[in-house]
């Protein structure tokens, strides 16, 4: 019996005859190439990506709730765990609604613009601009001295403005942390 092969980036099952994951490096919506996985949380997976028409970098957020999702098959379809089908579908719709709401208010100062939201592979993807940069925690760790209050305020003001824009339309971020 041959051991099951798993993609080290998205943890999807690989067929024995393929050498490249059909999901990572694959093209979504006919326009976005999925790159390396950057992070994973309870809501889903964040990938680097490329928009293939204008050839610019993007960030792709995939709805994949770990507590509700079964293993992704070789067909790249995301399946809910047995008994979690209704909650999976409901939260998938919530994910799509959230990113479509953010798309309507961006580009608000301090928020990455949501460029596209679409369904494919029995999941939802949100494509966002990728302005580059490094996470705040990494920037702080690499500094030789503490940050002044004025520098911190100036640097974080766009974040405050973005959160305020979200609150004005009834959205709550729930994911702000120095690692982002």
Task: Label each region the model flagged.
Residues 116-117:
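Activation-segment/catalytic-loop signature of the eukaryotic protein kinase fold
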Residues 98-109:
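Structural motif at the C-terminus of the N-lobe alphaC helix and the adjacent alphaC-beta4 loop
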Residues 35-41:
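Protein kinase glycine-rich loop
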Residues 155-156:
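Activation segment signature within eukaryotic-like protein kinase domains
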Residues 121-135, 139:
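Conserved short submotifs of the Hanks-type protein kinase catalytic core
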Residues 163, 167-180:
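Catalytic-loop of the protein kinase fold
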Residues 52-100:
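ATP-binding glycine-rich loop module of kinase domains
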Residues 44-50:
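ATP phosphate-binding glycine-rich loop
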């Amino acid at each position: 019996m041959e051991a099951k092969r798993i993609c080290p980036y998205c943890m999807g099952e690989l067929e024995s005859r393929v050498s490249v994951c059909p999901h990572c490096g694959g093209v979504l919506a006919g326009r976005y190439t999925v790159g390396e996985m950057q992070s994973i949380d309870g809501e889903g997976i964040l990938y680097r990506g490329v928009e293939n028409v204008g050839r610019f970098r993007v960030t792709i957020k995939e709805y994949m709730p770990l507590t509700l999702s079964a293993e992704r098959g070789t067909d790249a379809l995301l399946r809910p765990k047995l008994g979690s089908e209704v909650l999976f579908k409901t939260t998938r719709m919530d994910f799509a609604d959230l990113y479509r709401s953010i798309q309507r208010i961006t580009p608000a100062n301090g928020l990455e613009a949501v460029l596209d939201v679409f369904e494919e592979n029995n999941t939802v993807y949100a494509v966002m601009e990728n302005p580059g940069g490094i996470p705040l925690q990494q920037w702080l760790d690499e500094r030789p001295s503490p940050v002044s209050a004025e520098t911190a305020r100036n640097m974080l003001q766009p974040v405050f403005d973005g959160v305020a824009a979200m609150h004005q339309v009834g959205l709550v971020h729930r994911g702000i942390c120095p690692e982002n």
